[in-house]
Amino acid sequence: GYNNESHNHNDVGSCVVYVRDIPVLVDAGVGTYTKQTFNHDRYKIWSMQCDWHNLPMINGAAQPAGAQYRSKNTSCDLSKGMFSLDLADAYPPESGCRKWVRTYRLAPKGAPSVTITDSFALDARTQPDVEHFLVKGSVVLPGGTHQGRTLPDGELLILCDEGLVVKMTFPASLKASVDVMELTDRRFSGVWGPSLRRINLASPPDAPAKGSYEFRITELGKK
């Protein structure tokens, strides 16, 4: 994909994840159409922006709009439940990104899970990376408690509709926080309810310029 498609959002490489038809990682979609939706201020609308999709900020930089910002080296193997693409060219030069290969893997057997891996190489580390995940549900962060258990570093829970509980594991070096987007536009709230939450997983300022992040999303059942 690339960031100059019809009705474009800056979201090359993003995904959605549902568990048993229940939304977990979501794409907010588009709000009520206004003049801004179709003019030069389009990308000031939050739902059009990279950082409100399931994508990273690389070295502090988000994906911009433009046909030159695109993925490359796309690969899909249905027999292995795997899809990957290099997002480096979807980010601006100031990101210093030489490689950012995102891989999605499905594990339908046993405990169903989705694993998202970002393997990267930067020219230099100038700012933290921040991985974003937009979720429908409340979030229990590391250090929080759920049903009497305190969550360790590198683990959070997403409490979804219909009592579904989903676990996300991630590198313990990433600092987790949550932002709440109140949905005042009825076109959003009619689909998602009163709010969505964005999980932010930030690397240390001095994180290596080469490495990988792995995120695993696993169903824990309904509780």
Predicted regions and their residues:
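Extended polysaccharide-engagement surfaces of secreted carbohydrate-active enzymes
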Residues: 1-223
